Amino acid sequence: MPANNMISREQAEALIREQVVPEIFQKAATQSTFMGLARKLPNMTSKQTRIRVLDVLPVAYWVNGDTGFKQTTEQAWDNVYLTAAELAVIVPIPEAVLDDAEFDIMGEVTPRVIEAIGKRVDEAIIFDKARPAEWDAGIIVRARQAGNNVANSSDLYAAILGENGVFNKVEEYGYAVNGVIASRGMRAKLRGLRDDNGQPIYNTTMQGATNYALDGAPMYFPANGSFDKDRAQLIAGDFSQAVYAIRQDVTVKILDQGVIQDPSNGQIIYNLAQQDMIALRVVFRMGWALPNPATALDGDRLGCPFAYLAPSTPMTTQTVTFTVTTGSGGDTANVEGAIVDVNGARLKTNSSGVAVFNLPAGSYTATIKKKGYNTDTESITVASSAVTKSVSLTPAT
């Protein structure tokens, strides 16, 4: 027998145990950035919750002389509604796959689905992407109508903190910035800021950790994939002004009966019982609002407690022009000072009865009102061209 005979690794491969690390390497599931910063209200007890907000401020007048007449004033309130919208997903899994898996598939899928819910919430509320029809316009759209968008600039410091910068836009309406959301690429831009002598402004040492904050307001860099760099580079605002409430917390249910159907054609995709499958169903319902009450600096509620730094190529919007008149036939007149509310974004008509919005593609509901006239409601669809809308208000009787 040769002295160099041996059992090689190849010959014994079938008997060698392969070490399997009982862990799946993945990032910790991240939740909604917006829900971590905004103010949470008590859970909703129905699909819609009403918030009363100050709409008209009282005015004080000087009295002329000892026998002067004291003038009267008014104060009014408006209703802002939180409407619960539903997020849901179904994950079908064959039972054979569950039986053969080395990991708890259900335990791995659930946190990723919850992260996906957080991403959708942030996209809809902050960036107005895939927004439910019953929700108000997102923060970016509201800020845009208030003029709280700042063009991209090579002088990043001035664009954010200087006069007419992002922070100043918020402050002009009487709010103080208490939080900033930015793309992850903004970290490098801030670290690269230099003064006239070439010294770093944002961090003083390359070895120490950088404390990301602006004018005392902490910065957050969403890791759930929701931040849209094509719509904003940075968003700053008073997050205490934004509120949300939960109608149904994240509910996970495992189904082993029923069918999954294609809603477009009615075709059955999966029959759980017949195909030995289960389905993980996750449901979440919540509503949000930006009440934007009247303040001493914004009595008409035309402002927004948020502002943003636009990307080099601003997001595509179309002008939506409302012309508000009263009367009929040849006896018509422009209505100046009418409030046009498009999904929460408000503008006031000028002396020509005109209010011009800049809106991304989507469907909107407009409410036009003025004291002494009946309120009018219009539906608006924005696509790839400008939209004009003529509105005729009738005097209240």
Residue ranges and their predicted role:
Residues 339, 344-355:
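Short, acidic Ser/Thr/Gly-rich low-complexity loop/linker segments typical of extracellular
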Residues 2-89:
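Assembly/oligomerization interface modules of large self-assembling protein complexes
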Residues 371-396:
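Structured interaction patches on ligand/partner-binding surfaces of diverse proteins
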Residues 45, 142-278, 284:
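Extended oligomerization regions of viral-like shell subunits
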Residues 1-20, 40, 270-317, 397:
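Protruding loop/beta-arch "assembly-hinge" segments enriched in small, turn-prone residues
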